[in-house]
Amino acid sequence: MAASALRGLAVAGGGESSESEDDCWEIGYLDRTSQKFKGQMLPIEEKKENFKKALTTGDVSLVQELLDSGISVDATFRYGWTPLMYAASVANAELVRVLLDRGANASFEKDKQTILITACSAHGSEEQILKCVELLLSRNADPNVACRRLMTPIMYAARDGHTQVVALLVAGGAEVNTQDENGYTALTWAARQGHKSIVLKLLELGANKMLQTKDGKLPSEIAKRNKHHEIFNLLSFTLNPLEGKLQQLTKEETICKILTTDSDRENDHIFSSYAAFGDLEVFLHGLGLEHMTDLLKERDITLRHLLTMREDEFTKNGFTSKDQQKILAALKELEVEEIQFGELSEEAKLEISGDEFLNFLLKLNKQCGHLITAVQNIITELPVNSQKIVLEWASPQNFTSVCEELVNNVEDLSEEVCNLKDLIQKLQNERENDPTHIPLRKEVSTWKSRILKRTAITVCGFGFLLFICKITFQRK
């Protein structure tokens, strides 16, 4: 039954078509006792047939016996696959080790299909794939050789969600920002498939999130198109504080870091290491002001407070004029405008004209519209459950209390606007009923005046047209 389960796994790496899977791989019971005594006497074709069956069933001891009987470790079966390539395709680390120890060529490739690519796209557990990749890298397999579609091993590992394999390949010299025939990088593949842990790891390893595909799409846009909104938000930040964190480590240090951490701890580390950076830290890192992080934390200054600071507050909290300019430029880029309602109140005086008062009301109405749009945008962007929150948040009670204050302020504003409306209506009624009031003369447009205006406009139009024509002819 184990052999039956393995039969469907012998597929060319990366989903590329290969007829090798139809290479007469018969699966059935092997009489180990008879094979042990008759191995030396079998003809070469029968030995190869038994070799294929042993590879299929993962029978390591029989593989060793057949190799001892004289069959080549790099024997090619029909369509060109070697035993090592087949062992890698089913992520059989023990079999890979035996074949490599017997001198199998780790750099073998068939039609641009390398053994390392086959291992990275294998159907198996990440633990077994990781061991196979480690063994192949130890025998100088090149992690940057691409297949016919220009996909490298790290792209296959990122596509299939193997975080530790990605990190190990980079430690082995894999290029993070290589692009395939469609312009996809490993980061683009991870974003497309929704592998958040891979995205975080690649950013940590120096992946460039601004590389576009051939159709001009960024990894963030690819994630959004495939409805991975959490990854879209993650890639839309100005700068990821983890970016390039492991680039300065040596190959040996990185391998040690990866292999001494079990998979559960590795996953915990990936998420916790990013969660340790709140929205304030991300904002400051993006502006190159990370030196202000500790100071602002000591003074309990949040990102919201920072974005609404006045000039004197910046100076009081130790920001230089250069730092202030960076923050103000970022606010302008993000289109975060501080609404100065204090200026509006100065216009509401008795001696203002009707036009000024109307402008005041229009401006107030426009600002309310902006606020409504801003709240609607926030509602649509917020994740639907707490597990999808990327950055560290403060206590939800802080948010709800502020929202309650906002509701009260909106109710007060509504009441005051109603009072203003009633007052304006009252003034209008009193003015209409005042016998001393002289109503404004309404301009009455007669048919004669309308004809005169149209005639004047037509004459001016023809005159302007003749003037243009005259200038054109003079130039010629």
UniProtKB/Swiss-Prot annotation:
Q: Which residues form the SAM domain?
A: 273-335
Q: Which PANTHER family match?
A: ANKYRIN REPEAT, SAM AND BASIC LEUCINE ZIPPER DOMAIN-CONTAINING PROTEIN 1 (PTHR24157:SF3)
Q: Which UniProt keywords apply?
A: ANK repeat, Cytoplasm, Developmental protein, Differentiation, Meiosis, Phosphoprotein, Repeat, RNA-mediated gene silencing, Spermatogenesis
Assembly and partners? Interacts with DDX4, PIWIL1, RANBP9 and TDRD1.
InterPro entries referenced in this protein's UniProt entry, alphabetically: Ankyrin_rpt (IPR002110), Ankyrin_rpt-contain_sf (IPR036770), Asz1_SAM (IPR042650), SAM (IPR001660), SAM/pointed_sf (IPR013761)
Q: What protein is this chain from?
A: Ankyrin repeat, SAM and basic leucine zipper domain-containing protein 1
Q: Where in the cell is it found?
A: Cytoplasm
The ANK repeats are found at: 46-75, 79-108, 111-145, 149-178, 182-211, 215-244
UniProt xrefs under Pfam families: Ank_2, Ank_4, SAM_2
Q: Where are the Phosphoserine modifications?
A: 17-18, 20
Which SMART domains does the record cross-reference, listed alphabetically? ANK
Annotated Gene Ontology cellular components are:
pi-body
> Per the UniProt entry, what are the Gene Ontology biological process annotations, in alphabetical order?
cell differentiation; male meiotic nuclear division; regulatory ncRNA-mediated gene silencing; spermatogenesis; transposable element silencing
**Function per UniProt:** Plays a central role during spermatogenesis by repressing transposable elements and preventing their mobilization, which is essential for the germline integrity. Acts via the piRNA metabolic process, which mediates the repression of transposable elements during meiosis by forming complexes composed of piRNAs and Piwi proteins and governs the methylation and subsequent repression of transposons. Its association with pi-bodies suggests a participation in the primary piRNAs metabolic process.
The source's domain of life comes to: Eukaryota
